[in-house]
Amino acid sequence: MAATELRGVVGPGPAAIAAPGGGGAGPPVVGGGGGGRGDAGPGSGAASGTVAAAAAGGQGPGAGGVAAAAGPAPTPPAGGSGSSGTGGSGSAREGWLFKWTNYIKGYQRRWFVLSNGLLSYYRSKAEMRHTCRGTINLATANITVEDSCNFIISNGGAQTYHLKASSEVERQRWVTALELAKAKAVKMLAESDESGDEESVSQTDKTELQNTLRTLSSKVEDLSTCNDLIAKHGTALQRSLSELESLKLPAESNEKIKQVNERATLFRITSNAMINACRDFLVLAQTHSKKWQKSLQYERDQRIRLEETLEQLAKQHNHLERAFRGATVLPAHTSGSAGSGKDQCCSGKGDMSDEDDENEFFDAPEIITMPENLGHKRTGSNISGASSDISLDEQYKHQLEETKKEKRTRIPYKPNYSLNLWSIMKNCIGKELSKIPMPVNFNEPLSMLQRLTEDLEYHELLDRAAKCENSLEQLCYVAAFTVSSYSTTVFRTSKPFNPLLGETFELDRLEENGYRSLCEQVSHHPPAAAHHAESKNGWTLRQEIKITSKFRGKYLSIMPLGTIHCIFHATGHHYTWKKVTTTVHNIIVGKLWIDQSGEIDIVNHKTGDKCNLKFVPYSYFSRDVARKVTGEVTDPSGKVHFALLGTWDEKMDCFKVQPVSGENGGDARQRGHEAEESRVMLWKRNPLPKNAENMYYFSELALTLNAWEGGTAPTDSRLRPDQRLMENGRWDEANAEKQRLEEKQRLSRKKREAEAMKATEDGTPYDPYKALWFERKKDPVTKELTHIYRGEYWECKEKQDWNSCPDIF
């Protein structure tokens, strides 16, 4: 064997197989430098030194081992006061920062560790082993810089860290590292989202599983090859050295040959050890691989059986419903007709069980075909040949010619598309629905920004509230406005489009109704939208809403997070409240129906007045009015002045509370009785437009929201092509366009992540994405970090200066 080939097998030359004893006593070197350049793997020299040390009775590492350990081991820099460094144990960064504790102690020095998308802190570095004082998940957190040294990390109210670094440079290093860690955490948390981050769940899971099995198989093959090569080269080395020893050489060379033979013996010992280790690992890996494959196949079979079982149950449920409707002689109640509370109460379950005839949502072996008769349908109602006199193209052309004054009163009817529902929904159970790509078949042709703007449909309630001199009466109208925002949801079972990052929507009704509104998608992970509306009638409404949703198999829960603010200019009364949970029932089988449940506390931060609204969840066993809402308006002392009663889909009434005197002259009960003569109707729902069931059950306002208007920002939802195509009935084209927009957004996100990573590596400042028309800062009333309108939008519109708008469509 040639000398170069021998070196390729053994290591980097004779030094790698030097005789033991050259090193002093000390621990054997298990790894390190000095690795070979051939098939022997990384560091035969180091391994030789290790085995030699063991064979020599615990002596120090051989020459190769010494060479590997000669350089000083790098030590992480210790963070000083307010400083930081790269920590070990997989941490991205760790060091001292000052954390705000309370007004007595102020800022206190704490040891912070940033690792795996989590920021944890301890009182000292020694505490890391046993006591963690707090941890915040960066995937759902927001990072805000206050000044040269201070910055804030908050996850929306539950946890907020006010931190201070020792210098501006240290602060920037921390913020950059945190932004990068957040980007990575978000990427891991949300591998797929509706706006197009990744592929569908089923395809992603399958690809990941195949890649894992392929990698394991490749590693097993590599180990098997390594095993064969080490045995082959070890035998060749021993044979070559034996031949060398048998040659007739001068006596002085015999000693060196003997020494080389000893070293070769050591290499053989090392090789045998490596061969044994490889063989053991190979056997173990093969054994576990078979177990994993068997377990995986079992789980696959179980999943298939469960899917088949659920499919059969869905069919049986559908047949039972058909049989029930065929057997009943009672007329079906239609919740679309406005009725009194008494009528609703009498209908009881009928509201939920019979309100939409022929509205099946079950899985069929191949496709689901929607029924013909009109009603509350999931994927659309049939279009008869005589229902429309003009084509979709002509309708679209007509809507482009509409002016602001002439609001449109119709949109193209919803087409009847077939959809294999179960193939999509079966992979969504337990998942965040906004992160799962869905076809437009599940959508309505409005974005979430436009749905948010629909809260202003009954803006006149705020106009009346602004004129109230009594703060308690004003609170009653604010409460009615809060309830009115849910009135359109009773029929709207389709989901809105998830806005793209930077997407906006304006609604200028200053001339007609005295208000104008602006929404912007300010965050993509988590998805969040900011909204600002102002009226010349004396009020301002603003909010930042994050929508989270979970599909539980039978129902879908939608949880809006965020605070809504309403400020009245004349009095300075500032009201805040949050939204309740929306639940969509019968996702897989049965008829879709929506319920609102939970409590809303409306607080007047100037006077201390409060209103507690209770949205009563629907129950099949309850005799109460469906969709019932009750409420009480109290002063700062807790005394009830008004009682509220109604339903969130019809109307709200107000009663002035008259206390009843007790035997001793005091109030016998705090609330007293609700005098019928004091009843005042605060709000009543407007009737739906004609043929609303064919137009996604849109209200009069909703029909106008996507109408084209000139002069809007290039990021306006009206200009979103997939949404426009869907509205005009071209769903196949809309799905293709949706994929294009998703890919474009995905590339933009990856570009920002690459820029953040490069900034971290270079140690340069990195400015994360910021909203264009809203600024993230602490709310002066709630102390929450939220996006507040910064201004300039309407000025830019007047000048038609949209140079700062991103290209998102």
Curated annotation (Swiss-Prot):
Residues where Phosphoserine is found: 192, 195, 200, 240, 242, 340, 347, 353, 381, 384, 387-388, 391
Binding site for cholesterol: 316
Gene name of the record: OSBP
Provenance organism: Oryctolagus cuniculus
Residues annotated to bind ergosterol: 316
PH domain span: 90-183
Effect of residue 298 to S: No effect on cholesterol and 25-hydroxycholesterol binding
GO biological process, one term: intracellular cholesterol transport
N-acetylalanine PTM positions: 2
PTM remark: The N-terminus is blocked.
Gene Ontology cellular-component terms listed: cytosol; endoplasmic reticulum membrane; Golgi membrane; perinuclear endoplasmic reticulum; perinuclear region of cytoplasm; plasma membrane; trans-Golgi network
Region described as Disordered: 17-49, 63-91, 332-355, 729-761
Residues reported in the UniProt entry to bind a 1,2-diacyl-sn-glycero-3-phospho-(1D-myo-inositol 4-phosphate): 119-124, 495-498, 524-525
Transport keyword on record: yes
Ranges in a coiled coil: 293-328, 732-762
UniProt binding sites for 20-hydroxycholesterol: 316
Lineage, top ranks: Eukaryota, Metazoa, Chordata, Craniata, Vertebrata
InterPro entries: OSBP_sf, Oxysterol-bd, Oxysterol-bd_CS, PH-like_dom_sf, PH_domain
Pfam families: Oxysterol_BP (PF01237), PH (PF00169)
Start-end of Gly residues biased regions: 20-46, 79-90
Membrane topology label: Peripheral membrane protein
Description of how the protein assembles with itself and partners: Homodimer or homotrimer. Interacts (via FFAT motif) with VAPA. Interacts (via C-terminus) with RELCH (via the third HEAT repeat). Found in a complex composed of RELCH, OSBP1 and RAB11A.
GO molecular function list: cholesterol binding; phosphatidylinositol-4-phosphate binding; sterol transfer activity
Protein name: Oxysterol-binding protein 1
